[in-house]
Amino acid sequence: MPYHNPNSRSRRNVLRIVGVLVVLAVIAGVANFLHATTSEAAGNVKPQIETMQGIRQTAQDSITFAQGLDDPDRFAAHIETVQQCMDDYDRLADAKQIKYLLSDNLQERIIGLLYRNQQRTIIDSMRVAAHNLDGQTKELLSAVDAAMADDFSQHAAQWLLQVDDPTQANELIDRYGKQRAYASMREMLADLRSLHKLRSDVKQQVSTAVSNLHNAEAAAAAIAVPERNGDLDPAGWYTLATNVVSTMGVQIEQTMEFNCGGQSGENPSGFVAAYYCQMPDRSQRNVVHMLTTHPDWTQTARSPWLVDMVKHELSHRSIMVSCGTTQPTIAADRTEAVTNSYSVLFFGADRNRIADQQQGVAEYAMDAHSDQLATAIHDGNCG
């Protein structure tokens, strides 16, 4: 009769359980090892790839910025080169070996272990591609910077004279007057965006100043001016002239000596009885000068001609606000005639009285052409 050992079955069960536990422990150990290995591999590479992705994003943002400027075609070649470099980088970054490496799925990361050598090679190539992309982004942003600086150098002095409030124009001038250096292309892009925004704000202020100017001109032209000398006494004529300039935010300054732009004491041809100075520091922007030592001052001060003279000088100012200079290109050698036409057309100065008072002075003589040029300036065409 066979011997029956009741403990043998229990022993076998125990051994089976132990075996299963060992297998599970091995599997868990392998899984933990693979998880740690893949996580470590991804952790070592992710900061590098994030840096490269930052370079790529800056490149894309730089293209978008350049394409949004006034004349993006001038940057077309640079944009195309940056786009090519970005495409080169994207082809590498989109490789399946890199996607396996960075996947949140453990199974895919484990598969990625089979491509370790290829991953290293691709990542090395990505570094080169990102470096090239960063360099070409710098070329693009440098071209944008140069174009913006050129526009600034051509127009900043004009903008400063044109705007009613010079705060932002002075800020723009101050920023361009400083040496600018950047630690990264992202920093350079941020600064150029800021400069562009500031420049756009200043240009909008110029447009607003011109619009306000035209409204004020209409208000000044609406002020009634008596026709005869005896209608007002000298104080009355001066008060009327003051009311006209005040409408424009301007004041009259009486002086005994011609003094404009370093020409102190000089009165061209002895003709000037009133004048307006265009000074780069805006110090004379809102001032009209009356030369009380002019031989005809006593007579002028008792007549509506005083108001016409003031309107002529205000027209110099209006042309400056519109064009950034009292002598715009479109006026050519007819600055004074065009200014007279402007005073008649937009300030309501008396054409016949002006012609009579300036008879024989050819450069001041108005005609249809000077009227046409004055209208063009008022409409925003400075030549």
Enumerate the language-model features and the residues they cover.
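Post-HExxH zinc-binding segment in Zn-dependent metallohydrolases
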Residues: T329-S370
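Pan-zinc metallopeptidase signature
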Residues: S207, S211, A374-G383
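Active-site recognition of the HExxH zinc-binding catalytic motif
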Residues: P304-G324, T339-N340, V344
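Second-shell loop/turn segments in exported
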Residues: I223-L232, H294-P304, T325-D333
